Amino acid sequence: MTQTKKIYISDVTLRDGSHAIRHQYSVEQARQIAQALDEARVDSIEVAHGDGLQGSSFNYGFGAHTDLEWIEAVASVVKHAKITTLLLPGIGTVHDLKAAYEAGVRVVRVATHCTEADVSRQHIEYARQLGMEAVGFLMMSHMTSPKALAEQAKLMESYGATCCYVVDSGGALGMNDVRDRFRAFKDILKPETQTGMHAHHNLSLGVANSIVAVEEGCDRVDASLAGMGAGAGNAPLEVFIAAAERLGWNHGTDLYKLMDAADDIVRPLQDRPVRVDRETLALGYAGVYSSFLRHSEAAAAKYGLKAVDILVELGKRRMVGGQEDMIVDVALDLLRQREAASL
């Protein structure tokens, strides 16, 4: 990568970060965080329930506000950054996408499991019809090979996505894993199609993996203030920017404003520290969807189990995003096994 190439900085504090506090951002908190990010000159600010448009539900957890209330609050203060949102086909609809567009969203990341890009077609095509920028977002990218992942990205590109993401939802990718996936993308995607990296910090590799991605030609990097996100969080934005600064990379943001926002605004909101610990490390080790953390901890407390045991079993069963309802089933299975062993 040349030093002159501008890295697109995509903040996810107000979407992925929502997982860390069970989707309970107040409208005022969303407004305050967005204003701080905008003043620090990030390129985009993603806003939604942690599980995307219409994610507020029994399965994922109910948000303190609707997506539109959060989006409108952010739109009222943002002057520079593009307002972005996330949509999972089958949860969010084209009607939700249109409403988000009318509220101020200009970029949508259409997210599917890493082997299911074909379900993104309707939403990517509709976003382009609205005049939005459509981005393909391949979750749990560690669960398929680099070549197969690139083929899925190619599908999204064919539907109209102008950028395709490697999404390490489980925080399970190593640096060579990231390198291999971006090289596979480069081999198959059009030169004009951008690529992005969405890292999680469960193995403490969020920043390192993002750096490797940029070294391999990645155009966009997701990160969040104080790492606010599911599991051990995303790549901490202020840390990535500091590292990029030392490497002489062009990121276009104000490091000190990001540091202040991380410590003064975001970190105090964490009711559970966003960090690598026993449970979040288990996510990366077992390759489990990072947003399963809080659900698994709740199930463990309810049934007198260890959250780590639940998470490792979820990894063995290769559970993916959207199967949150199975966490209780796994807990009950473990409880039955424990009771049988004690007889």
Swiss-Prot record:
SUPFAM superfamilies: Aldolase, post-HMGL domain-like. One of its GO terms (biological process) is catabolic process. Keywords: Aromatic hydrocarbons catabolism, Lyase, Manganese, Metal-binding. Belongs to the 4-hydroxy-2-oxovalerate aldolase family. The keyword Metal-binding applies. InterPro entries: 2-IPM_HCS-like (IPR050073), 4OH_2_O-val_aldolase (IPR017629), Aldolase_TIM (IPR013785), DmpG_comm (IPR012425), DRE_TIM_HOA (IPR035685), PYR_CT (IPR000891). It comes from Comamonas testosteroni. Mn(2+) binds at D16, H198, H200. Substrate binds at R15, D16, S169, H198, Y289. This is 4-hydroxy-2-oxovalerate aldolase 1. Pfam families: DmpG_comm (PF07836), HMGL-like (PF00682). NCBIfam families: 4OH_2_O_val_ald, PRK08195.1. Residues 7-259 form the Pyruvate carboxyltransferase domain. The keyword Manganese applies. Gene3D superfamilies: 1.10.8.60, Aldolase class I. The record marks R15 as: Transition state stabilizer. One of its GO terms (molecular function) is 2-isopropylmalate synthase activity. It is an enzyme of class 4 (lyase). Its EC number is 4.1.3.39. The lineage of its organism: Bacteria, Pseudomonadati, Pseudomonadota, Betaproteobacteria, Burkholderiales. The active site is at H19 (proton acceptor). It catalyses: (S)-4-hydroxy-2-oxopentanoate = acetaldehyde + pyruvate.
